[in-house]
Amino acid sequence: MDAIDFVKKNTEEIVTMDEAFKALNNNPKGYIGFEPSGNPHLGTCLLLANKINDMVNAGIKMTVLLADWHAMVNDKLNGDLNEIRKSGELFKRAWLAAGLNSNVKFVWASELVEKSDYWSLLLKVAKNASLLRIRRSLPIMGRSEEDADRDFSKYIYPLMQVTDIFYLDVDFALGGMDQRHAHMLARDIAERMNIKKPVSVHTPLLSSLKGSGRMDSFKKMSKSEPDSAIFMTDSNDDIKRKIKNAYCPMKEVNGNPVIDILKYIIFPYYNDKISIKRPESKGGPVDVDMDSLTRMYISGEIHPVDLKNAVGELLCDIIGPVREKLTGD
């Protein structure tokens, strides 16, 4: 694969592709900011580690910013920095156990905010941002304007995220689609400040195992809803139970969390080839890649029960070694 193919792999959007091509030719640096909180799940551990590795394989020097101060501002773990840092250390162990490239650098936000030039840069960023634009960026932290009006520190959060990007001097800003507002804000402010704009690489978010109701908007895996996500500490029985109960409509791949897990977690792990057991009356075992699986599922050749059985077993194989390193079980 070419470098750009690694960057594009399993992404929702790249802003912009032309800038990405150019940046890849100049010893690029990249970063992803992460708020430590709770326990690692498929999305915050495996999907994230896979995508960071893609960026490393593209020749990008990647940094993970463990955003402890951001998590404190966002009231994660009751704003307790000690607990937030414990969570950050847990995520570091989980990512490395999941195969994160050992050359990836970890930096704590607390290391940055101790430096006076960080805050002078933040003020320059603020001078080039309007209150209206900051308000529009609040969804990056899952907050509303009303939340920020009650706690002004939340207006500082988007400014910190932009400052992180500039302070680390990165060419690529990686994040889920929920971080798009912050990355677009950084690009706009960079243009006003006449400095390089970060290429924004956005990944999909893993949907809740429960799916979304007909009138509901997208729901992602959430640590606050244990049955909506597969956690790295889940037992094999829990993994299989959650997958068995997961939303998986017959012949539908869009909005199907089981299909998403296959696409973003399982196929990358198994080099795009797995085997699915079916009753002999339904054709027997079949080897598939993502394209053939999609066709066969839509046509009804693969039943949801057989799909779930395969996904449950494969996830147990993937998560088992990670769980053992985290818990000893």
From Swiss-Prot:
Sequence positions that bind ATP: K223
Motif ('KMSKS' region): 220-224
EC number(s) reported in the record: 6.1.1.1
Keyword set includes Aminoacyl-tRNA synthetase: yes
Transmembrane segments: none
GO molecular function: ATP binding; tyrosine-tRNA ligase activity
Alphabetical UniProt keywords: Aminoacyl-tRNA synthetase, ATP-binding, Cytoplasm, Ligase, Nucleotide-binding, Protein biosynthesis
UniProt main location, coarse: cytoplasm
GO biological process per UniProt: tyrosyl-tRNA aminoacylation
Binding site for L-tyrosine: Y31, Y157, Q161, D164, Q179
Substrates-to-products reaction catalysed: tRNA(Tyr) + L-tyrosine + ATP = L-tyrosyl-tRNA(Tyr) + AMP + diphosphate + H(+)
Gene3D superfamilies given in the database record: HUPs (3.40.50.620), Tyrosyl-Transfer RNA Synthetase (1.10.240.10)
Cellular component GO terms held in the UniProt record: cytoplasm
Family to which this protein belongs: Belongs to the class-I aminoacyl-tRNA synthetase family. TyrS type 4 subfamily.
NCBIfam families: PRK08560.1, tyrS
Known role: Catalyzes the attachment of tyrosine to tRNA(Tyr) in a two-step reaction: tyrosine is first activated by ATP to form Tyr-AMP and then transferred to the acceptor end of tRNA(Tyr).
Quaternary context: Homodimer.
This protein's name: Tyrosine--tRNA ligase
Record organism: Picrophilus torridus (strain ATCC 700027 / DSM 9790 / JCM 10055 / NBRC 100828 / KAW 2/3)
